Amino acid sequence: MLKIKGSQDAISNDLLLWSGVKTQVAVQEVYSIKVHPVSSQLNDGSAMSFNIPSQAKAMLSKVEIFTSFKVKKGDNNLTTEDSVSIINNIANAMFGLVQISINDRTELCQSMRNSYAYQTYFDNCLNCDLDRSDYLNAVSAFVMDSGVTKADAETMVFSGDGVKNKGAAKRAQRIAGSKTVTVCTPLHHPLFTTSKALPTNMKIRISLTKNNDSFLLLADSDAYNIKITDIYLKATFLRPNDIFLNLIEERLAKEAASYFITRPELILKPISESGRILRLNNLFSDGRLPKTAFFAIQRSKDFSGSSITNPYTFIPFGSFNLHVNGVPHFADPLETNYETKDGQKIYGDCWNFLKQLYEVIDKDKKGAGMINSTNFQQNFMVGVSLASDRSGITAGYLNQQMHASTNLTIDLGYDLNIAEDLLLLIFCHWDRVVKISGTREVEIIE
């Protein structure tokens, strides 16, 4: 009996002859509202503001962005002679700046330009499974870039001997002939993607600013432009049964509702060193460590946007290690080697980088992610869990707050041209609690 000490009693399911089925009685109705921008100016560079109307008896469950656009060459429609494509993640990258405020006081988003474009790209790449590829392509034109090297995914859809970037070629088919393309994406903020609905009578304002054409397009020149023809938000609400709604309001009057979410943040570290070995210290402000961090190297001109570069391809490197309070995070640095393919010298065996990434995003036991061995050259990054138990991004609990010094060492590699003007991109997740009271006061705790 020792082996079952501490175990709980159980009855086999085939003996439960009178077990019932749960009945949903709390939600009376689900409905959606289309929210159009306050101004009709969609392409003049100003912010497009959306005011989601508060509902007295319904709770906000989800917000989606629907955007219709066309790509043209000047004022002319595209022809078969034009080699142009949209970048990946266009449904989110369309907006260079996204601002979300609650009750006109609490700002929820990072204010840095293009932070939303990169955060959503990382979100999709790290959290979506490969078997969602067809859905993401159909709904949001999200198709991963491909090619042997980073250069293959940079600009042109076609390059001499044929298609180099098949992902870009697939996206180019959507815009051929300057036909109208409509894409849909959830509003990417943890407060709007959590399983909990927001209370009634919430005043929410969302501001979207269109990104630069040079950031959004892959082409051989700046002759092309992208115009938004229509845009609206779809806000979905749940209306509880009056009895449950009253119970919720009574509880809120006594105790604020807690939303345990994460705060995504994109940190940029300019790299001033011109040598092969990069060393950076004190990566996080105040020494406070995030729950997880993903490291990639990018060129400054790619981050700000240029038609002849791809913002969503990163620069590979030879080795990586992070020291926390002087202790190496990896017993041996993550390293790769080189090989020659199609006459080009490229990074070869990257399995330990991919293995580390899959462990942090919890894909090591759950199948392939959007980033895999076929496109890792374009999406070269390192995932690190800095939680006390080194748990992955899907861990559904808070970790102890940790403070530590950090020192990063990256070897860019041998015999490769080292680009100037490099940036270290760090995509972080921080634990955050948002409390909403009965008077709809919002408190953020980190």
For the regions a language model picked out, list residue spans one by one.
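Short, low-complexity Pro/Thr/Gly
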Residues: 1-446
